Amino acid sequence: MYKRQKLANTYDVPVTVRSGGTSLAGGAIPVCGGIVLLMERLNKIIELNAEGMYMEVEAGVRTVDIQKYANEAGFLYAGDPCSAESCLIGGNIATNAGGNKAVRYGVTRDQVYAVEVVTPTGEIVELGARLKKKSTGYCLEQLIMGSEGTLGIITKATLKLQPIPPYRFDLLAVFSDPEQALDVVPKIMQAGINPTSVEYMDNSYVRGTADYLEFKGAPHYENGIYVIITVETFSEDELDLKMEQLDELCSAAGAVDVLEADERIWDMRRNCQESVRLISLVSLTDDVVVPVNEIAGTIKFIMKIGEKYPFPVKINAHIGDGNLHIVLCKCELSDEEWENKVEAFHKEVYTYAYSIGGRLAGEHGIGAKKLREMETYTPAGELAIMRTIKAAMDPQLILNPGKIFDL
């Protein structure tokens, strides 16, 4: 691989790395032509070290296979994107993927000790180390994470493992009022419950996913808004205490029902994106992130402005960490009206989110999709430093060109 990259650099040939192809931002599309580098054959789990609590894997291993391998050895790999069945770990690192467990364990960069990278000029470098802390200059492994294949080709990764909490409960709090559903979240976070997941589905998603999965007994199908909460602990007494707290908090906030969330409820959450095809073959998914204390206001804002647009607006969210997924459905709109209205809608949402300290993407990345918006909704000084780094590491500008920003 490094020899191919040296040749590409010598002859100024663009190279785009394609991992699992699950990007929702066009990150793996070769917009400038050239070579597309497929990673699926780099699929070996090299080592699991139980004493050191780490795994070393190649970049083409499916995330779900890493999770299963760790679980079989009695450990947890905490990275858990909803596309785990099909995405690859290299792509997770390149986009700094999040997922359902990020509220407790953090995003992908929090699960990685080190990476092996082929640089744009064709050198093989190892960045990072299996250390809980270090103070030895720039943290270059973190620079690669979230760079979307523009600064280097990730070939291997050393991943952190966690002990598996033996006690777990999944709770479903159902609300009829979206404001009540949203306002309960800061109370949960302030109570010290430290949930593993806090997920939100508006009623259009409750009905849509239940229909898609043919789940006829979905609780409060007609008007329910779901807040799904997972709590994991290392003692049964602690779990009982936290579940009692959650029940009281949700009931006091106005929940019409508080029950156990079985696997069918999680299937609904995981199939939000797929369920959209029941009403529209064309849809667009967005991925803004805002400060956690602003998420209720942001969803209320989106619901309000959505009323004036001619397409359905559906919202699911990792509300525990401020990350919203807004899905717009084309349905029967003409191409021209769809494109014009979508652009206007996104401008309103991005402007609002940026004004309260938010950013364009929480876990999907910028890719080619939001390249233009990156100029408007990112601080100028931040962009300038990014461009300087890109030019220094990739002087020929051949690695995944046309992504994140223009040079």
Q: For each predicted feature, which ranges?
A:
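Glycine-rich N-terminal segment of FAD-binding domains in flavoprotein oxidoreductases
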Residues: 3-42, 318, 353
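A glycine- and small-aliphatic-rich helix-loop capping segment at beta-alpha/alpha-beta transitions
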Residues: 9, 27-43, 71-75, 99-109, ...
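FAD-binding subdomain of flavoenzyme oxidoreductases
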Residues: 44-199, 399
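Activity-critical C-terminal alpha-helical subdomain
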Residues: 123, 371-407
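C-terminal substrate-recognition/cap domain of FAD-linked oxidoreductases
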Residues: 163, 174, 182-348, 352, ...
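Alpha-helix capping/hinge segments and adjacent helical runs
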Residues: 354-366, 391, 395-399
